[in-house]
């Protein structure tokens, strides 16, 4: 199928979803439950990375020689015009929390199936800038964390990691700029409870790893027992 036809179909289904929210975001079929965002057929077609089963997977390699991360993984591949991109757009720009709940549920399934994630004491969502929070009304990573816990992962939620100021997004900087900027990207508050605890940092999409690297540097002040990372998606470049 030509790319332009796929693009037209994608925009058409997104348009329908604005007015008929109980249809599948991908194929447009009726959904059986109001909490769904994808039908069972489209959910079954999600592109899993299976990074959790790989030694030295691409996400782990992002942090080699930079920050101590015991284990890192991403659940799905993120590419343009994909189901995963639609889910992220729905969550971040259309305020569709059901998309975040789905992404969190899928991560919870992966955590239960993979002992490399254990133990987990705290889930730590990557915070967003204050202006984005005001505009969006919520932090998408927090929605994913809440869904992970709601789907059976016994961990506490820590929200003491804060964005320090409204800086340019990390993706607009080169690696050297990101590294020099990382120490001022986050503030950490009320962190005494994290000492010797096992932390799982959670975000929606990982591209370069720079933002999570900065979070790890800030969290190191708390002297945690271990730090692990999971994201809903990994940008395939």
Residue positions per predicted region:
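Glycine-rich phosphate/pyrophosphate-handling loop used in enzymes and phosphotransfer proteins
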Residues: 1-202, 207-237
